[in-house]
């Protein structure tokens, strides 16, 4: 896994065959930990999907831990992660550290029920999908895009309502504008199941 613009630490492991060097994220992948850090893009989603599929092939019966620190991003890229989380056999436990906003919050809520966590000072934000970049073209084309955006909004609200055990009307109301929550508020809303003060408080 490569992360641009900053140095990724290397971990040295000793074995009977000598030393092996891993970048820190590859080492954590051995512990079945997958990271989504930064915007949800086609590239970051592809990395997450590949790691989820790899971990399923390694052990289809052992949980995967998906750590999220993301401001959100592409709906289609995020849905590729979402569909893979549901497609694979292992339970996917989600954990927010830092922030989970927009598509990041949606993926956080989509973890296995009872296994969705946040650290105490995490921030979670939900809202309706946005059009990124300038939208131009003929009026009929803009109308097509508007209809598609409304379909996406309805689908995301319906799925998140299911994950949060809430009425669809609640999500339609609460995602109308940027809706920021603390970890405690996210738990009360149903986006997560538990706030982790430390590793000892983890209950699976």
Swiss-Prot record:
It is an enzyme of class 3 (hydrolase). Keywords: Cytoplasm, Hydrolase, Protease, Serine protease. It comes from the Bacteria. The active site is at 102 (nucleophile), 127. It catalyses: Hydrolysis of proteins to small peptides in the presence of ATP and magnesium. alpha-casein is the usual test substrate. In the absence of ATP, only oligopeptides shorter than five residues are hydrolyzed (such as succinyl-Leu-Tyr-|-NHMec, and Leu-Tyr-Leu-|-Tyr-Trp, in which cleavage of the -Tyr-|-Leu- and -Tyr-|-Trp bonds also occurs). One of its GO terms (biological process) is protein quality control for misfolded or incompletely synthesized proteins. It is found in: Cytoplasm. Its EC number is 3.4.21.92. GO terms for molecular function: ATP-dependent peptidase activity; ATPase binding; serine-type endopeptidase activity. The keyword 4Fe-4S does not apply. Its main location: cytoplasm. Fourteen ClpP subunits assemble into 2 heptameric rings which stack back to back to give a disk-like structure with a central cavity, resembling the structure of eukaryotic proteasomes. Cleaves peptides in various proteins in a process that requires ATP hydrolysis. Has a chymotrypsin-like activity. Plays a major role in the degradation of misfolded proteins. Belongs to the peptidase S14 family. This is ATP-dependent Clp protease proteolytic subunit. It comes from Neisseria meningitidis serogroup B (strain ATCC BAA-335 / MC58). The lineage of its organism: Bacteria, Pseudomonadati, Pseudomonadota, Betaproteobacteria, Neisseriales.
